[in-house]
Amino acid sequence: MLLAEELALVAINPSSGRHGLGLRAEINACLAGLLVAELILDDVIAPGDKTGRVAITGRVEPKGVTLAAATAVVIDKGPKLKAILSGMDRGLSRRIGLGTWDTTVAGLADAGVVEATSGGVRPRNNLIQGFVRDSTVAALRHAAAGDGALDLRTSALLSMTGPAKLLEVVAPDRKARGHARNRIDHALDGTVLEPIGRLVRRLISEAVAAAGAATVAATS
């Protein structure tokens, strides 16, 4: 399962089959970050000559349609990570007909973990293999509650639960959320994936600020 698919699965509420209301932009940014992280971990791309840039290695082919499309976005929008992350949703849609969220849940549906998308205004993906989500959530809770070093895949996934607004899922005990938030915020510190975590958060902050400014302008 791709890192982005794992995050999408955690974001799906088992009761509704949907992610939290109004969180698509935040989740899409995090999914884009995880797709790029996956490409780095697979050695399809590597950090570039400057911070915040990446380059195709030419050593490894991307695995599967989703990562192949994500690689095409990297080639088209790169080398700057910010442009790649900003363009991922539209880039995937242009290449495979699905945006970032729909691409990842389609992968989950193909694997039999969730049902195919259904519904109109607010589509849903009911869980089929709830134990898969339970296992992923349990691993994230263990990582968030601990103090030890994490492998890069776990670090990447844990890092994105913060900006994806999944803290309450990862740390259901309110008293433990301070520690969990610290683990999430610093999960990628000093790693090759740190620029991705930083830029995802920046993009979300900029989008929130722009939306706030637009609201003020519309009401003034």
Task: Give the ranges of each region predicted by the language model.
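Acidic, Ser/Thr/Pro-enriched low-complexity segments and adjacent helix/loop capping patches
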Residues: 85, 90-99, 111-127, 131, ...
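Hydrophobic/aromatic-lined pockets within catalytic cores
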Residues: 12, 40, 44, 109, ...
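Charged/polar, solvent-exposed surface patches and flexible loops
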Residues: 9, 69-73, 83-86, 90, ...
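Accessory beta->alpha helical hairpin/"wing" motif in late/C-terminal subdomains of nucleic-acid enzymes
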Residues: 49-72, 115-145, 151-157, 174, ...
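Short, charged low-complexity intrinsically disordered segments located at boundaries
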Residues: 38-42, 99-105, 135-138, 170-172, ...
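Short, amphipathic alpha-helical interface elements at domain boundaries
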Residues: 1-93, 100, 213-220
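Leucine-rich, amphipathic alpha-helical/linker segments
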Residues: 73-107, 146-174
